[in-house]
Amino acid sequence: GRYDRRRPFYKTASPSMDILVSSNLERLLYLLSGDDALVAQLMQQLNEEGTYEVPEDLLAKLRALFWAGCCDDAGAKAAIGSVWREHHYLCDTHTAVAWDVAQQYKKENADHNEVVVLSTASPYKFPAAVLEGIGESAKGDEFDVMEQLHDVTGVPVPKNLAGLRSREVRHRDVIEQGDMPVSYTHLRAHETRRHL
């Protein structure tokens, strides 16, 4: 029942899962507890100490609703490959994690509950990892790899992604993490001047 944002941060092929502070968990804690004061206290502890402990009664509610497992990048790529071969469905890396953990659940639990896995993103947002999952090597830049994925699978590239190559890049600045407080101060000063 301990949530600790001080843990090591790992980058994976599923970047939406690479987080240290989960706002979805905050909402879930409120939905299950109905106690905004408790959730505010936990979030304050997280902000000030980097960690909090979920009370036993709330942890019991979480455990009654959820089953958890782990899936690394290799497992996700293997899931992408098996889903493609067995179901001819091209899934993204996040969905592959869900699929892999769903298979773990089915192996470890004889309750015969139905399992629903919802796709959360286009495989074309992660074309290199998806290509590797179906046994191909990615070649070229992200746009080349999207075309390669389409050529290998026949799955259409979404129009919003297919048109990106010819669009103008709007944001070119890269700010190093160490420079962020300075950049934030600069932006706030600029915003203030703009409204004067």
Give each language-model segment a name.
Residues 7-16, 62-65, 167-169:
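Short beta-alpha connecting loops at secondary-structure transitions
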Residues 34-112, 170-177:
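Active-site-adjacent helical/loop segments in soluble small-molecule enzymes
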Residues 159-184:
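Long, charge-rich low-complexity segments
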